[in-house]
Regions:
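ABC ATP-binding cassette signature C-motif
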Residues: 1-127
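Short cytosolic helices in intracellular loops of multi-pass membrane proteins
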Residues: 126-142
Length: 143
């Protein structure tokens, strides 16, 4: 277990000399890394991450991506880091207007599919409006 702890802490950017320092000596960003390490080492069935890359350097972000891809069972990520999300995801769920859309793809492909879906919805709406106008005009003729 010690090797796993060391690997996780090193992956998140800590040096071996940091292992014996009290948590209170670390800045807020480094404390966030400590908490992230605690979560990852518990190996939960589901990990919920809110902006996990905010306090990480590039190497730590890459390590976290690799760790999550290879070790996590399920991850829900809320992030503005599009590259991180794109590299990590293989499923994107959109919740909008009371509906759930499930895309079994990465984030970039989801964006394309969402655009296509919205264009189809707009086209359908416009066709529906034309049909309503035609029916209304027909009814008005026979009043």
């Amino acid at each position: 277990y010690d090797a796993e702890v060391e690997k996780t802490l090193m992956g998140l950017g800590f040096m071996r000399s940091d292992f014996t320092r009290p948590t209170k000596e670390f800045s807020g960003g480094w404390r966030m890394r400590i908490e992230l390490a605690k979560i990852l080492l518990q190996k939960p069935d589901l990990i919920l991450l809110d902006e996990p890359t905010n306090h990480l350097d590039i190497e730590s972000v890459q390590w976290l991506e690799d760790f999550l891809k290879n070790n996590a069972k399920a991850v829900i990520v809320i992030s503005h880091d599009k590259a991180f999300v794109d590299n990590l995801t293989n499923r994107t769920i959109e919740i909008t207007m009371g509906k759930i859309y499930d895309y079994k793809t990465n984030y970039s492909h989801y964006l394309q599919l969402r655009k296509e879906r919205r264009e189809q919805q707009q086209k359908h709406f416009e066709e529906q409006q034309r049909e309503i106008a035609d029916i209304t005009a027909f009814i008005e003729r026979f009043k």
